[in-house]
Amino acid sequence: MEKYEKAAEIFKAFGDPTRLMILKLLAENGSMCVCKIIDELKKPQPTISHHLNILKKAGIVKARKEGTWNFYYIVDDRVKEIIKLVDEL
């Protein structure tokens, strides 16, 4: 059951257009600071942070700190393949 609960959490994280756009940016760029994601998506910082936290909680992305900046990146390359499939729809 635990495996399916984790899978459901991951699928829920994929279930939002903003999160899919964030994942597309990360798939294309490797890693990005929050400020660049905000600039690209033209959404407020609290909105982007909220979505990044959901992706992080689901284990899809991680953050690394460089000085005062947080850089986010995709943990598993299979996520990049999922984003490619979404782009082909």
Swiss-Prot record:
Keywords tagged on the record: DNA-binding, Transcription, Transcription regulation
Domain named HTH arsR-type: residues: 1-89
One MF annotation (Gene Ontology) recorded for this entry: DNA-binding transcription factor activity
Origin superkingdom: Archaea
The keyword Transcription appears for this protein: yes
Keyword Transcription: yes
Record SMART domains: HTH_ARSR (SM00418)
Any single Pfam family the record assigns to this protein: HTH_5
InterPro entries linked to this entry: ArsR-like_HTH (IPR011991), HTH_ArsR_DNA-bd_dom (IPR001845), Metal_resp_trans_reg (IPR051011), WH-like_DNA-bd_sf (IPR036388), WH_DNA-bd_sf (IPR036390)
Family matches, as NCBIfam families: HTH_metalloreg
Protein name, as recorded: Uncharacterized HTH-type transcriptional regulator MJ1325
Annotated source species: Methanocaldococcus jannaschii (strain ATCC 43067 / DSM 2661 / JAL-1 / JCM 10045 / NBRC 100440) (Methanococcus jannaschii)
